[in-house]
């Protein structure tokens, strides 16, 4: 899962949206640095990552990547799941339009920015103003996201080419998303993530 899915599942679970978004920017034990609700959100994010990576649908999808891009498949798929969530938001969350949800999520996250790591602050400078969560529905934007990640981290250069794997298996990936994401939504609503 990437930013949008983590925020969405956190909302359904009544967990800290801030903690769920912040988690990738925090190493080790967060308990000394953040309030309990944010810590709980960080831990939820980490559980979701482990759960998602071990889902049979996701393990199967990783195998569709070519040998030269398979190493970055987990990252590429996380971004792709956000694409499908953004694209199908009105079906999955009909009572909370995506643009309204993005505004709500931004308000929640802004409360912790003053005490956040610089890289997280930098992310927030772009995430909201450039409407990333809404733009995830556009595959051209997904390609830009993957290229941007590859540019910032040269060891992940294979992300550029992983775009072709997404394109080649788009329909099958969308089917897998529909197989597992509604289950995760139900788990979040039951606070079972």
From Swiss-Prot:
Keyword Lipid metabolism among record annotations: yes
UniProt superkingdom: Bacteria
EC number annotated for this UniProt entry: 3.1.4.14
UniProt keyword terms in alphabetical order: Fatty acid biosynthesis, Fatty acid metabolism, Hydrolase, Lipid biosynthesis, Lipid metabolism
GO molecular function: [acyl-carrier-protein] phosphodiesterase activity
GO annotation, biological process: fatty acid biosynthetic process
Keyword Hydrolase tagged: yes
Catalytic function, reaction form: holo-[ACP] + H2O = apo-[ACP] + (R)-4'-phosphopantetheine + H(+)
Pfam family, one: ACP_PD
Disulfide bonds: none
Alphabetical list of HAMAP family matching this protein: AcpH (MF_01950)
Described function: Converts holo-ACP to apo-ACP by hydrolytic cleavage of the phosphopantetheine prosthetic group from ACP.
NCBIfam families recorded: PRK10045.1
UniProt family annotation: Belongs to the AcpH family.
Annotated protein name in UniProt: Acyl carrier protein phosphodiesterase
């Amino acid at each position: 899962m990437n930013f949008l899915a983590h925020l969405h599942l956190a909302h359904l679970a009544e967990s800290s949206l801030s903690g769920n978004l912040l988690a990738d920017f925090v190493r080790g034990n967060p308990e000394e640095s953040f309030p309990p609700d944010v810590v709980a959100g960080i831990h939820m994010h980490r559980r979701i990552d482990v759960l998602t990576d071990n889902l049979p649908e996701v393990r199967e999808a990783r195998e569709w990547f070519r040998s030269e891009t398979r190493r970055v498949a987990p990252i590429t798929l996380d971004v792709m799941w956000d694409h499908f969530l953004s694209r199908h938001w009105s079906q999955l969350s009909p009572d909370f339009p995506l643009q309204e949800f993005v505004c709500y999520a931004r308000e929640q996250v802004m409360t912790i920015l003053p005490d956040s790591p610089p890289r997280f602050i930098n992310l927030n400078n772009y995430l909201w103003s450039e409407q990333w969560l809404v733009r995830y529905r556009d595959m051209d934007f997904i390609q830009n996201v993957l290229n941007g990640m590859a540019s910032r981290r040269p060891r992940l250069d294979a992300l550029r080419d992983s775009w072709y794997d997404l394109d080649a298996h788009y329909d099958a990936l969308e089917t897998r998303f529909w197989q597992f994401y509604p289950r995760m939504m139900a788990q979040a609503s039951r606070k079972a993530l």
